[in-house]
Swiss-Prot record:
Annotated segments matching region Disordered: 248-270, 298-363
One cellular component term from this protein's GO annotations in UniProt: extracellular region
Application in biotechnology: Lignocellulose is the most abundant polymeric composite on Earth and is a recalcitrant but promising renewable substrate for industrial biotechnology applications. Together with cellobiose dehydrogenases (CDHs) an enzymatic system capable of oxidative cellulose cleavage is formed, which increases the efficiency of cellulases and put LPMOs at focus of biofuel research.
Identification of the protein by name: AA9 family lytic polysaccharide monooxygenase I
Residues making up the signal peptide according to the UniProt record: 1-19
Enzyme class, spelled out: oxidoreductase
InterPro entries: AA9, AA9_LPMO
PANTHER family hit by this protein: ENDO-BETA-1,4-GLUCANASE D, PUTATIVE (AFU_ORTHOLOGUE AFUA_1G12560)-RELATED
Gene Ontology MF term list: metal ion binding; monooxygenase activity
UniProt: Cu(2+) binding residues: H20, H105, Y194
Record lineage: Eukaryota, Fungi, Dikarya, Ascomycota, Pezizomycotina
């Protein structure tokens, strides 16, 4: 093994055990609720009651493709339902805030809903059938590895806003929000899923009941959007999972990995400069999310909901296993495409990092 490949392997292994991220708070139509702080609440004898589901992923790690057929993929490892629910209406807005996200963990950000058909606090997660309501994938392919929905999330202070479909029937629902990191997906079992779940009570006069897919059937490790090498130039990317539901039609009948929307590009020679607000170049069916919140507010350990007037600037949460991500190093593919790079927590996607990476790869 060459020194270059060995160094990339060592750095990649270090990145795989370091902390990544999780949802720390949720804003539902202007009311703020606490997320499940896995590196804190897991060690408390009486954690607060939340709308967020608990998990046992104290390493803030991921679910790998080899576990797609297990219950861990539904709402993360060892997930249990939250005791509370946040009320919203069809057309309502939900913003989910992550504590942090490594700049090199590029990939799609996907959100689903599933009707609990009863009380979500006692639902059997293995029975939940999810339909996709929001998805972002490859935004710009002008320079490897491209600009992704995760980069938009970082630029929006680690948040993404989704809109509840305007025709959804009233009821109790689980909202499943997920990042799929693809920095190592060129390797077998290399994709990393980070699902997070919350409970919603949707009221109103909607009547739509979209067809859903069991959590254990959302993805296959052979899906084109799962086994992909982002360190090679991509002309398109198919977001994994069932089709995106659009109000007025039940479009959620496609099988895993076979459904649009995908992102298609024409080759260009000039890369547009990245800004703090990124425009998603996708098909019209995918542009469903509302404008993301530009400033992150506080992370609190109090009971929910939180009064929004008490919000203060957030500090990054540290992983119980890996600590701070302020210099997080990711894993690249074993063929040696671009050595691992680091980035500050609030990086605005400096394009020069990949130009430098490309020049080193060619040397």
């Amino acid at each position: 093994m060459s020194l270059f490949k060995f160094a990339a392997f060592v750095l990649g292994t270090a990145g795989s055990v370091a902390g990544h991220g999780y949802v720390t708070k949720i804003d539902v139509d202007g009311t703020t609720y606490g997320g499940y702080l896995v590196d804190t609440y897991s060690y408390e004898p009486d954690p607060p009651k939340l709308i967020a589901w608990s998990t046992t992923a104290t390493d803030t790690g991921y679910v790998s493709p080899s576990a797609y057929g297990t219950s861990d993929i539904v709402c993360h490892r060892g997930a249990e339902p939250g005791a509370l629910s946040a009320e919203t209406l069809p057309g309502g807005s939900v913003t989910l805030y992550w504590n942090t996200w490594p700049t090199d963990h590029h990939g799609p950000v996907i959100t689903y809903l599933a009707n609990c058909n009863g009380d979500c606090a006692s639902v059997d997660k293995s029975t939940l059938k999810f339909f996709k309501i929001d998805a972002g994938g490859l935004v710009d392919n002008s320079a490897v590895p491209g600009t992704w929905a995760t980069d938009e999330l970082i630029a929006a202070d680690f948040s993404r806003t989704v809109t509840i479909p305007s025709d959804i029937a009233s009821g109790n629902y689980v909202l499943r929000h997920e990042i799929i990191a693809l920095h190592s997906a060129g390797n077998k079992d290399g994709a990393q899923n980070y699902p997070q779940c919350i409970n919603l009570k949707i009221t109103g006069s909607g009547t739509a009941a979209p067809t859903g897919t069991l959590g254990t059937e959302l993805y296959k490790n052979t899906d084109a959007g799962i086994g992909v090498n982002i360190w090679n130039a991509l002309s398109s990317y198919a977001i994994p999972g069932p089709a995106l539901y659009t109000s007025g039609s039940d479009s959620n009948t496609a099988t895993s990995g076979a459904s649009p929307p995908s992102t298609n590009f024409s080759p260009t020679t000039t890369a547009a400069a990245a800004t703090t607000t990124l425009s998603t170049v996708v098909t019209s069916a995918q542009s469903t999310s509302a404008t993301v919140v530009a400033e992150q507010t506080s992370v609190s350990y109090s009971q929910t909901p939180w009064p929004s007037s008490t919000a203060t600037e957030a500090t990054s949460a540290s992983s119980s296993a890996g600590g701070s991500n302020n210099g997080h190093t990711g894993t690249h593919d074993e063929a040696g495409h671009c050595p691992a790079h680091t980035g500050k927590k609030r990086s605005r996607l400096n394009r020069r990092r990949m130009a430098s990476c490309s020049s080193r790869t060619q040397s």
